[in-house]
Curated annotation (Swiss-Prot):
Keyword Metal-binding belongs to the record: yes
Cofactor field: Mg(2+)
Entry superkingdom: Bacteria
Similarity-based family: Belongs to the polyribonucleotide nucleotidyltransferase family.
Domain S1 motif residue range list: 623-691
GO cellular component term of the entry, any: cytosol
Protein name stated in the entry: Polyribonucleotide nucleotidyltransferase
Catalytic EC class: transferase
Subcellular location: Cytoplasm
Catalytic activity: RNA(n+1) + phosphate = RNA(n) + a ribonucleoside 5'-diphosphate
Disulfide pattern: none
CDD domains: KH-I_PNPase (cd02393), RNase_PH_PNPase_1 (cd11363), RNase_PH_PNPase_2 (cd11364), S1_PNPase (cd04472)
GO biological process: mRNA catabolic process; RNA processing
């Protein structure tokens, strides 16, 4: 590439896309600065010189956020960026998924792709710029890579598709789709939607692919100008004679073992065959490298046989038809003290979801590069090792768990009631208790049931299903409800969630170079059929959301005040609102428009807090009568509390019809007085009169007589 700076530009969805090479990060194998509008992302690709002694492709993709990109200084004492945000982790996964299938089988050199977000224009996606830059950094480098790929965001406003919609357009859009692929095929889809029909989702994907082709042509132009010659990489290969020997020893027995229907029995049967073959090689005293290759050959034989049975004989490992769903069952209300719970079981995959309702003050505060500051609906996914019958450390959530949690959140968010209709913060936690594939989709089903059990008035129930694919040449088979082995050995994991009306979320990962429209269409239609079957099973357990909330859930009372009165409720340094909270034990959340949410498990305390607030914001009206209480006595008169927080002065001359020499001769502290408001002066001071009330009473009595 040399040291000379090169600049390339095109128009991308009405904004300028500029690529700079040759100036920054020149010691990386490949580096590009991508500028999209005012968004700037530096993407680099680096590879180790020698292959690693591992049995997988060691690729790492990092999307690094820097708060200086939006003019922020990190909070806390350290003032540095800490662990990656959830958004950064999801963006890293988004970039990883379309580039991973485009490295050769047997690639064992470590590859690291890093994108640092240096400037953010909120209307020009930094994730899409980073995906473009990651592909291009690999393509201009000397690292063997079968790209390029590109990705775009697709929205739909007023039934028209939009490439890379602005934030304002996304607010109105019923689709938020990210699609990536090569110039020939699609290899990654990630989407959220408002119950959009499958046909429209497919059109959106294909619409995005047309723009991808243009971006790839732009990358190819840049590579032709500044790309490095690709280096020779030693790929991991297995000796062909050894392969034939192992096949002869194991193939027939593996065929029988693979077709054992129950997961653990099948795994044990396969392990037994593998161990017998390995034992024979160990007797012959082969070296470690040979034994490692024997293990790899055995794993490949299992993979090949599973794939052959599915494509040629339409036989799945557990004996199901290609479009058959595993046995379904569900249950609600398992945990008495939680606000709602749902258990969903599909074959040997089981998820228990718990719904917790909180006040609006319990929202998650977000501190990142986006404009969104808080989140009132959350879905968290946990995958403990016991769910697959294994041991392991209990750590915090990893990338996979965060990704699955976000997918469930995206699938369920469209059916969550608005803050106006249901002023609660909602947190769902899905605990995977058993795993044999499709756990993320089981968590969506369980979470729907948990919300219904909690009494959340959802717009419609959502179910999810994972579709698979086994493709050999032009022959392919689409599988409904894939289990773990089919996910591991197949070519696609296509997760589809939605209601009876349409799709709310999609996620597609593939291990081959890409998929045609025909396969996508078949997978979506087969998924719809499966989703309807699952929804029917779920609704037989609980047909609709419960009418009452759990007695342990907070009760929320909503009231509105004049926004100008908010300061009276809060008081100086929060003194007033803190006193209300201390006296009643409630939580209080105040919106800028004067809407106040009061929450507590005790409804009487909500009402008490409401009464205090009403008194604080109540307006004193001139000419009105009030029954007040004497709070303070001075030589010049008595101060009377009309209601909480509102005092007025009855001057000594206004205490009685006759002349009063001493205030204490007429009233004492604690006395109740009926008084009339005669004036509110420019400083807001309230002047009261008892004399005026007595005069009116006297006149009425005289009229009667």
């Amino acid at each position: 590439m040399g040291q000379e700076k090169h600049v390339f530009s095109i128009d991308w969805a009405g904004r300028k896309l500029t690529v700079e090479t040759g100036q920054l990060a020149k010691q990386a194998n490949g580096a590009v600065m991508v500028r999209y509008g005012d968004t700037a992302v530096l993407s680099t690709a680096t590879a180790s010189k020698e292959p690693k002694t591992v049995d997988f492709f060691p690729l790492t993709v990092n999307y690094e956020e820097r708060l200086y990109a939006v003019g922020k200084i990190p909070g806390g004492f350290i003032k540095r960026e800490g662990r990656p945000s959830e958004k950064a982790i999801l963006a890293s996964r988004l970039i990883d998924r379309p580039i991973r299938p485009l490295f050769a089988d047997g690639f064992r050199n470590e590859v690291q792709v890093v994108s640092i977000v240096m400037s953010v224009d909120q209307d020009c996606s930094s994730e899409m710029a980073a995906m473009f830059g990651s592909s291009l950094a690999l393509c201009v480098s000397d690292i063997p890579f079968e790209g390029p790929i590109a990705g775009v965001t697709v929205g739909r406003v007023d039934n028209k598709f939009i490439i890379n919609p602005t934030l304002e357009q996304l607010e109105k859009s019923d689709i938020h789709l990210v699609v990536a692929g090569t110039k020939d095929a699609i290899n990654m889809v990630e989407a959220g939607a408002d119950e959009v029909p499958e046909e429209i989702m497919l059109e959106a994907i294909m619409f995005g692919h047309e723009e991808i082709k243009r971006l790839i042509a732009f990358q190819e132009e840049i590579v032709a100008a500044v790309g490095k010659e690709k280096s020779e990489i030693t790929l991991y290969e297995i000796d062909s004679d050894l392969k034939e020997k192992v096949r002869g020893m194991a193939e027939s027995n593996l065929l029988k073992a693979i077709q054992v229907h129950e997961k653990h029995a099948r795994e044990d049967a396969i392990s037994e065959v593998k161990n017998e073959v390995l034992a024979k090689f160990e007797e012959e005293e082969h070296d470690e490298e040979t034994l490692k290759q024997v293990k790899d050959i055995l794993s490949q034989l299992v993979k090949n046989e599973v794939r052959r049975l599915i494509t040629e004989e339409k036989v799945r490992p557990d004996g199901r038809a290609v479009d058959e769903i595993r046995p379904l069952s569900s249950e609600v209300g398992l945990l008495p003290r939680t606000h709602g719970s749902g258990l969903f079981t599909r074959g040997q995959t089981q998820a228990l979801s718990i719904c917790t309702l909180g006040a609006l003050g319990d929202v998650q505060i977000l501190d990142g590069l986006g404009v969104e500051e808080s989140k009132r609906f959350m879905h968290h996914y946990n995958f403990p090792q016991f769910s697959v019958g294994e041991t392991g450390p209990m750590r915090g959530p990893g990338r996979r768990e965060i990704g699955h949690g976000a997918l469930g959140e995206r699938a369920l968010e469209p059916i969550v009631p608005s803050e106006k209709d249901f002023p609660y913060t909602i947190r769902l936690v899905s605990e995977v208790l058993e795993s044999n594939g499709s756990t993320s989709q089981a968590s969506i089903c369980a979470s729907t049931l948990a919300m219904m059990d909690a009494g959340v008035p959802i717009k419609a129930p959502v179910a999810g299903i994972a579709m698979g694919l086994v493709k050999s040449g032009d022959n392919y088979t689409v599988l409904t409800d894939i289990q773990g082995m089919e996910d591991h050995l197949g070519d696609m994991d296509f997760k589809v969630a939605g209601t009876s009306k349409g799709v709310t979320a999609l996620q597609m990962d593939i291990k081959i170079e890409g998929l045609s429209r025909e396969i996508l269409e078949e997978a979506l239609q087969q998924a719809k059929k499966g989703r309807m079957e699952i929804l029917e099973s779920m609704l037989s357990t609980l047909a609709e959301s419960r009418k009452e909330l759990s007695p342990y859930a907070p009760k929320i009372l909503t009231m509105s005040i004049n926004p100008d009165k908010i300061r009276d409720v809060i008081g100086p340094s929060g003194k007033q609102i803190n006193k209300i909270i201390e006296d009643t034990g409630v939580k209080i959340d105040i919106e800028q428009d004067g809407t106040i949410f009061i929450s507590s498990t005790d409804e009487s305390m909500n009402q008490k807090a409401k009464k205090i607030i009403e008194d604080l914001v109540r307006e004193v009206e001139v000419g009105q009568l009030y029954l007040g209480k004497v709070k303070r006595i001075e030589k010049f008169g008595a101060f009377v509390e009309l209601f909480s927080g509102k005092d007025g002065l009855v001057h000594i001359s206004e205490l009685a019809l006759e002349r009063v020499g001493k205030v204490e001769d007429v009233v004492k502290i604690g006395d109740e007085l009926l008084v009339k408001v005669t004036e509110i002066d420019k400083q807001g001071r309230v002047n009261l009169s008892r004399k005026a009330v007595l005069r009116e009473q006297k006149e009425k009595e005289e009229q009667k007589s």
